[in-house]
From Swiss-Prot:
Compositional bias annotation for Gly residues: 188-202
Protein encoded by which gene: Axn
Subcellular compartments: Cytoplasm
GO biological process: cell development; chitin-based larval cuticle pattern formation; dorsal/ventral pattern formation, imaginal disc; eye-antennal disc morphogenesis; follicle cell of egg chamber development; glycogen metabolic process; heart development; imaginal disc-derived wing margin morphogenesis
Protein's recorded name: Axin
Length: 745
């Protein structure tokens, strides 16, 4: 103002270049430029912009309260109780009826007990005194200290995030566009007054934003973050209005103008529309001469001879996108396009991701998927004069190319689609050595937690020593049974070298002299117990068990050596000793054995001779083939279940499975203070906690829990102990827990 003695302030590029629209009723009077500026500075900002000044402006406005409640419900539900309590206190202050005040105070107090807000002891005592003594006067300001505390919490925590939220910014954008549209429509209906005699271009609409100062900058509300609504295009909600502020005005912030050496700024060359032209990344806004010429041609017909000054300003209406304009600006648009943009489409959703060039496999895959053809596919097959190759060779080449394309996906790299998420990548700062203070701060809580768990276990063992002893006995008994079963199952005897040699010699001589005399037959060495171990689990008895009964006999030459056969089968197929649920003796084998026994029974002399020889050789055999003590122990259970030579196999007695043990339970007897009849429940486990006990309560609410327990004090050996922590174990009185539940105030 001081630089212009005439009192008329010069408009720069950061302000509206035309006067405000006429006030209804004053359309006939043409205003000066100074009046339009004065009106802009005097008018107050809209209410939705005042919400950013203080929290009181927001909570005193109806629309602001609705928007703030919606934001809290969607974005910060933890502050719902704070907001509801604040408005409940505001409603309480407006009441004058004592009865209404008493009801509202009781309702607010019940709400506070159920909410997450903490109630001070003074307030709790004051409300209890009001309930017990109705003569105490009720004050609607009883919750004022707590309301101030809640207000501070809202102002410090949720109010700043609301001002930066997308919901509030979008609301400002919509309201600004709506106000601008209404202003523009009102100015169009009342006529284009106040701009014809100014000698320059004017605006058909006005800026519905905060007032500007003399320096040309916005007066932004307090607590609004930069860019909250300064860089938001208004046309995103509504269509472009007939006119608005310049492209570098208050809506879009400072302009990107040319240098100050006298060149034309971007404001002078851009069209007067609510949207800016596209400005590519890594480029400077600059318009060529062809664009200016086309712009002047578009606006030349509607502008008068005196409306276009020396600066050749653009018309005030938005120019249309025509063919001539695209052709005129084609060269310049290609020049200002960034080099990296050729052949690459920018996606706004992937602006923060890195660009990786196509690999060989990706190129082949894209070529195959798009139906790309090779040179052999495009060759002519109608004539041999085109390429000089015969038809068969061209057909063979085409077939090979087709096969290559079909197998391209099978020959691709296998790890092309393996993407490691960014959240799972290792960072260097995660493996840095911790300082001593950080290590102590992280280690102490963990050690305290371990110590607390051990203390709880120790207390539980002290209170219930019988359960620990029972558990130890069960574990030791199960370990002993398991060890015995393993020993019985895998009890193996070491093979004697002499036994192996004797068995080999007996097999060789038996094959060479099949018709030997019974009197000269040498005794067959006994089979080691490892090869005659019977299976105990399914009642299946092997040949070894048959030989242990003492009834098996060596028959004459007409009787087949069944033990040797079984020994061969056992050595050749070890799986025959496995549990199959079927006896190892088939019906055919038993029948053949019985037939052989009946045929050999006719020779009484041979039987007597064989018995005499066996009795003579028995002492020598027992001394020669002495078995270790472990062998006799392993044969005892087998001999008791062996069968006779004339019968088949006898299955072992099947023992029924033991009944499942009843899970341990703890009986808890408790009662409420106002009920004479106690409750009796069963909680699974021997060490129930308070949390488990709460789950079985028939009521829900705030209670205190007392349990009867023993005390070392001789005057009062039985006391009521209060349990507070949910993880604490309930004390037992005898073999059950005796509890008393009291409602908490």
């Amino acid at each position: 103002m001081s630089g212009h003695p005439s009192g008329i302030r010069k408009h720069d590029d950061n302000e509206c270049s035309g006067p405000r629209p006429p006030v209804p009723g004053e359309e006939s009077r043409v205003k000066k430029m100074t009046e339009g500026v004065a009106d802009t500075s005097k008018n107050s900002s809209p209410s939705y912009l005042n919400w950013a000044r203080t929290l009181n402006h927001l909570l005193e406005d109806r629309d602001g309260v609705e928007l703030f409640k919606k934001y809290v419900e969607e974005e910060a539900p933890a502050y719902n109780d704070h907001l509801n309590f604040y408005f409940a206190c505001e409603g309480l202050k407006q009441q004058t009826d004592p009865e209404k005040i008493k009801q509202i105070i009781g309702a607010i107090y019940r709400f506070l007990r159920k909410s997450q807000l903490s109630i001070s002891d003074d307030l709790r005592a004051q409300i209890k005194a009001i309930k017990t003594n109705p003569e105490i006067p009720l004050s609607p300001h009883i919750f004022d200290p707590m309301q101030r505390h809640v207000e501070v919490t809202i102002r410090d925590n949720i109010y700043p995030t609301f001002l930066c939220s997308e919901m509030y910014i979008l609301y400002i954008q919509q309201m600004s566009a709506q106000q601008e549209r209404c202003t523009s429509s009102g100015a169009t209906g009342s006529g284009s007054a106040g701009s014809s005699g100014s000698g320059g271009s004017s605006l058909a609409g006005a800026c519905a934003l905060p007032p500007t100062t003399a320096s040309g900058k916005q007066q932004l509300p307090q607590l609004v973050p930069p860019g909250a609504f300064i860089n938001l295009p208004v046309s995103s909600v509504s269509g472009p209005p007939a006119g608005t502020c310049s492209a570098s005005g208050s809506v879009y912030g400072p302009s990107t103008s040319a240098s100050s050496s006298g060149s034309i700024s971007a404001t002078d060359t851009l069209p007067r529309s609510s949207t800016l032209p596209t400005l590519h990344e890594d480029s400077v806004l600059s318009l060529c001469d062809d664009f200016e010429k086309v712009q002047m041609q578009e606006g030349g017909g509607s502008l008068g001879s005196g409306s276009v000054g020396a600066g050749a300003r653009a018309p005030d209406y938005p120019i249309r996108l025509t063919r001539d304009l695209l052709i005129a600006t084609q060269k310049r648009r290609l020049e200002i396009r960034p080099p990296g943009a050729h052949g690459y489409v920018y996606n706004p959703s992937t602006t923060n991701t890195s660009y990786v060039p196509n690999s060989r496999v990706d190129s082949e895959r894209a070529s195959v998927s798009s139906g790309g053809r090779t040179d052999s596919d495009t060759m002519s097959i109608s004539s041999c004069s085109m390429d000089g190759r015969p038809y068969i060779q061209r057909r063979h080449s085409s077939t090979e190319s087709k096969a290559i394309r079909q197998s391209a996906m099978a020959n691709k790299e296998t790890n092309t689609f393996q993407v490691i998420p960014r959240t799972q990548r290792l960072h260097s700062n995660e493996h840095r050595p911790l300082k001593e203070e950080e290590l102590v701060s992280l280690l102490i809580p963990k050690l305290e937690e371990v110590k607390r768990k051990r203390d709880l276990e120790e207390r539980a063992r002290e209170r219930n020593p019988g359960a620990a002893l029972l558990t130890n006995e069960r574990s030791s008994a199960s370990d002993r049974a398991f060890a015995e079963a393993i020993r019985e199952k895998f009890a193996l005897d070491e093979d004697n070298d002499q036994d192996i040699l004797d068995q080999h010699v007996s097999r060789v001589w038996k094959d060479q002299t099949p018709h030997r005399s019974p009197g000269t037959m040498s005794p067959c060495p006994p089979i080691p117990s490892r090869r005659r171990t019977a299976t105990h689990d399914s009642g299946m008895v092997s040949d070894g068990a048959m030989s242990l009964s003492g009834h098996s006999m060596k028959h004459s030459k007409s009787m087949p050596d069944h033990s040797s056969c079984s020994r061969k089968l056992t050595n050749k197929w070890p799986s025959m000793n496995t549990d199959s649920g079927i006896s190892m003796f088939s019906a055919d084998t038993v029948t053949k054995y019985k037939d052989a026994s009946s045929r050999s029974g006719s020779s009484t002399a041979s039987k007597l001779e064989e018995a005499k020889r066996r009795l003579e050789d028995e002492p020598r055999r027992s001394r020669r083939y002495a078995q270790p003590p472990m062998q006799h122990l392993s044969q005892q259970p087998l001999a008791s279940f062996s069968s006779s030579s004339s019968g088949g196999s006898i299955s072992l007695p099947h023992q029924p499975p033991p009944l499942p043990a009843k899970p341990p339970e703890t009986i808890v007897v408790f009662s409420f203070c106002e009920e004479p009849v106690p409750y009796r429940i069963k909680i699974p486990g021997t060490q129930p906690t308070l949390r488990q006990f709460k789950d079985y309560l028939p009521r829900r609410g705030h209670f205190r829990f007392f349990f009867k327990t023993h005390c070392e004090d001789p005057d009062s050996p039985v006391i009521q102990e209060e349990i507070v922590n949910d993880s604490d174990i309930l004390p037992l009185f005898g073999d059950k827990a005796m509890g008393l539940v009291k409602p908490s105030d």
